[in-house]
């Protein structure tokens, strides 16, 4: 389906981009309104953010999922970025996650068990990262080029953090751009997922007082 154009009123539209934008807009809305599919929010998000985009690629676009970042990619680049970013963010978050706003927000939401917290955070973010740093990023890169794609996918990602502590929300545009850059450099959504999983888990563990 890549490159298929439809013309309406003399205006050309890329059909694949239309579908990607619809999915990238409607799925977060359905998630926001709390449509309960499994009884667990993280499992619901696997369906919304991972399974639906994946089925779209395979059944509708009829393209290899690797073309949308679902692969190991350039693992050397990915591993280096993952290690460096996680170390730097650990130092920053050690202090930021102790602020009253972060503690108030995450103490009420963090699971009691450390293992449960890490597990459910990983499940929750797996599909989330695939939608932005896989499905949307690589589709947009074809249509608009990688630079624009990296910026564009970061916008909805940042807006969906509204309601979280202000400091965290204000940094997410830059975080989303960084994640997109790493995904493009490594040609994989896996490394942004690993980084995001670490950042989210570490933040909750510090803010809720479960470690340090």
Regions found by a protein language model. Name each.
Residues 14-22, 78-83, 114-118, 147-152, ...:
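Hydrophobic alpha-helical transmembrane segments
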Residues 30-33, 57-65, 94-98, 182-185:
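Structural signal for the C-terminal ends of transmembrane alpha-helices
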Residues 24-33, 87-95, 154-162, 198-207:
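Aromatic-anchored segments of alpha-helical transmembrane domains
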Residues 35-44, 64-127, 142:
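Juxtamembrane helix-loop-helix connectors linking adjacent transmembrane helices
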Residues 30-33, 168-212:
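Functionally important transmembrane alpha-helices
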């Amino acid at each position: 389906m890549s490159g298929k154009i439809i013309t309406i009123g003399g205006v050309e539209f890329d059909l694949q981009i239309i579908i990607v934008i619809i999915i990238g807009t409607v799925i977060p809305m359905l998630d926001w309104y709390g449509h309960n599919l499994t009884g667990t929010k993280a499992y619901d998000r696997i369906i919304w953010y991972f399974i639906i985009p994946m089925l779209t690629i395979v059944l509708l676009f009829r393209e290899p999922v690797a073309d949308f970042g679902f692969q190991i990619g350039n693992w050397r680049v990915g591993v280096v970025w993952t290690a460096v970013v996680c170390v730097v963010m650990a130092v920053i978050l050690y202090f930021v996650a102790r602020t009253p706003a972060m503690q108030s927000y995450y103490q009420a939401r963090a699971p009691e068990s450390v293992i449960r917290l890490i597990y459910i955070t990983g499940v929750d973010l797996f599909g989330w990262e695939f939608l932005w740093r896989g499905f949307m990023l690589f589709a947009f890169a074809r249509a608009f080029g990688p630079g624009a794609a990296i910026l564009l996918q970061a916008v909805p990602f940042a807006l969906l953090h509204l309601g979280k502590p202000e400091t965290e929300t204000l940094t997410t545009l830059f975080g989303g751009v960084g994640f997109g850059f790493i995904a493009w450099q490594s040609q994989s959504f896996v490394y942004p997922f690993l980084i995001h999983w670490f950042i989210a888990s570490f933040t909750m563990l510090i803010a809720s007082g479960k470690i340090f």
